[in-house]
């Protein structure tokens, strides 16, 4: 895990383009080559999608997803697969963009999380710009939504889409 995190930090440090991590995470290339991501994107709803990603994430990365669901919220916390190892900014940003991008592509809706928080300050503004919400500094690397995600700030039923996630209520 530590070597993977250093690898990502080196990419961030050497890239002259600050938008490169956002483009990488939102490109869709990962879902084309990753069976767990493809399977998750073919889930009947966002909750199942996130649970499947959490189940298989250890196979494709050095971090874990902790998915929590209440009556009003669905959240994903990013946790290092190695206890005590803090996630670098680039990994938190890429994972947030990846998760929101996956839901957007599957639903064909401009979904926006209600909040995003990171343990370390996130200096690259492109992550927050992609998400549509600021990334605040907090005690966890966490993406939170009410219900699932909001669309244009209004409550609205999910219209059928060509993607796999079709039964998605929005707040």
Q: Which positions does each model-derived feature cover?
A:
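Extended mid-to-C-terminal alpha-helical interaction segments
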Residues: 121-171
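Generic recognition of short, well-ordered alpha-helical interface segments
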Residues: 3-6, 48, 94, 157, ...
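Conserved binding/catalytic microenvironments
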Residues: 24, 39, 43, 47, ...
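Short, mixed-charge aromatic SLiMs
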Residues: 2, 33-37, 117-130
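N-terminal low-complexity or simple alpha-helical regulatory segments
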Residues: 1-74
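Helix N-cap / beta->alpha transition motif
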Residues: 1-2, 77, 145-149
């Amino acid at each position: 895990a530590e070597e993977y995190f250093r690898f990502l930090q080196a990419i961030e440090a050497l890239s002259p383009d600050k938008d490169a991590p956002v483009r990488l995470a939102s490109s869709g290339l990962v879902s084309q080559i990753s069976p767990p991501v493809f399977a998750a994107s073919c889930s009947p709803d966002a909750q199942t999608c996130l649970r499947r990603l959490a189940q298989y994430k250890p196979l494709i990365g050095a971090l874990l997803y902790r998915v929590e669901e209440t009556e009003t919220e669905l959240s994903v916390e990013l946790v290092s697969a190695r206890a005590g190892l803090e996630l670098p900014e680039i990994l938190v940003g890429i994972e947030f963009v990846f998760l929101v991008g996956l839901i957007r592509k599957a639903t064909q809706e401009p979904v926006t999380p209600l909040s995003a928080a990171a343990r370390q300050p996130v200096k690259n503004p492109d992550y927050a710009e992609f998400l549509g919400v600021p990334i605040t500094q907090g005690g966890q690397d966490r993406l939170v939504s009410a219900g699932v995600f909001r669309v244009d700030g209004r409550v609205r039923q999910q219209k059928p889409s060509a993607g796999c996630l079709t039964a998605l209520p929005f707040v």
